[in-house]
Amino acid sequence: MLHLRRFGYTAAMTDIHARVLIVGGGLVGLSLAVALGHAGITTVVVDRESPAELVAPPFDGRASAIAAASWRMLDRLGIAGRVEDVQPINEIRVSDGDAPLFLHYDHRDVGDEPLGQMVENRFTRLALFRTVAELESVTLKAPVTVGRMKRSPAGVEAVLSDGDIVRAELCVGADGRMSRLRQEAGIETLQWRYPQDGIVCTIAHAESHHGIAHERFLPAGPFAILPLTANRASLVWTERSDLAPAFMELPEAEFTAEIQRRVGDFLGPVHVVGDRFRYPLSLVLAHAFRSDRLALVGDAAHGIHPIAGQGFNLGLRDVAALAECLTDAA
């Protein structure tokens, strides 16, 4: 029996054949796997992180505002009904600081359904993992990395860190803003680093948020208060990159006071629940979304500023377009 020692371990080599190899098992990569799985397209998903870590409460602290159209897509894929702790977004209010006037979006102006849903990413991941587990045509390999990949007119061959070799007709790069697959394919990008960091945390508050999402434009950048279940909200606090580290190091009481000052008193007293996180903000736009035997989706194709909360929603549009192409070609 052939064994690999190249990656510092001994493992039996197994050939896995599939139509599609997805590198990156995040929200977009797994959504694509589900869409392809429902169409009976054999798919292998590879991700470096353990699924158990990805659904742990303190993993990254992030939540997503999923637009109504995106939620309908997740519903058709059998995912939406599995997602726990879903908070409807009934209204959106956008203001310049604490000005009394604001831009107002109300779901009642367009229909009965909410404008979108707020969900902690870990609950969406958990629903995706459960759905993938039921699809016989989808194989999830994690935690595993791609050691070497060869793309040729005949297809794709990827040697994985566990010794397996995946042979596929197409590779999909869902491996994020710093996409290794995009770089190896020589696809150039337009990118820059904003002079801002995003501070992300969850707060609990005394008064009801009534399903209203708030976006306030402050001198350092937008400050978003996004409703979650159980009188909680997800905060995305955009701050100058030179000041954000100091805010992150504040004692709990002082950090909470800074948040209370920015939120105001309409939610009553607030306190931070769980950890706080800081992310550098950047833009990455690939000059091309495809190459020979390669397609890019999600942040690997277009990573944007979180100001409008559209990252995952744009990724789902990639999923819909690519799944349609592959299904039509089946």
Feature roles, as predicted:
Residues 60-84:
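N-terminal glycine-rich dinucleotide-binding loop that anchors FAD/FMN and/or NAD(P) in oxidoreductases
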